[in-house]
């Protein structure tokens, strides 16, 4: 990862043949360290000021960089959960510990960062897209950010609270393989009807290519998103009925070594 300067393109680690991860459409092959740095870069509340073990040279836009917190005082942070005057009051630490796979201290760090970025206690879709766009200045990330926002907004109220945020993060980072695959399926199932259609997957692929932008190597061909969708369905649509169910999705992913490796890259990100 480039420590300073412009953000790396999603195509930086692409193989010379231009192949992609079958599940996500992203270039294959990032190391766990590289993925950790990229993931932390996408989560301002997990930036270098919040997690001292991450290099201080980690590039985070100044507008998104969280304030350097004072040394964590467990009692004072817990008081913030109970007495916060923000618009949305989060649930208590103990309850969030029971609902997620984060420790008390991890929740404290995540909450302080989330509150720095979202003083009101929630983030709406437009703010989410604005934050996300700053990590992909070479492309248009707005559509993909909308899909990602909807995956975090599980109760579909148009906002992501701290509870929503850590619930999704807990699945992505600490969930079982099945948990993570279910979360990914929900991301791709845009209308939440229990199956993925070619139209939905094409929308996802186009949004990923849009986010990557035109400054990629090798240059992307116009038909690339549709070709990726066809490849996806050839692998995932086991009964060839034109849709991919959650059962087909999980079964196909579990048989794909590349996908399984990509799932394991999220282990111990924070």
Swiss-Prot record:
Q: Which residues bind Ca(2+) 1?
A: 153, 155, 157, 159, 164
Residues involved in Ca(2+) 3 binding? 237, 239, 241, 248
How is the polypeptide modified once translated?
Palmitoylated. Palmitoylation enhances association with the plasma membrane.
Query: Has UniProt tagged this entry with the keyword Amino-acid biosynthesis?
Result: no
Query: Where is lipid attached as S-palmitoyl cysteine?
Result: 45-46
| Family to which this protein belongs | Belongs to the recoverin family.
Please report the name of this protein according to its UniProt entry.
Answer: A-type potassium channel modulatory protein KCNIP2
Q: What is the lineage of its organism?
A: Eukaryota, Metazoa, Chordata, Craniata, Vertebrata
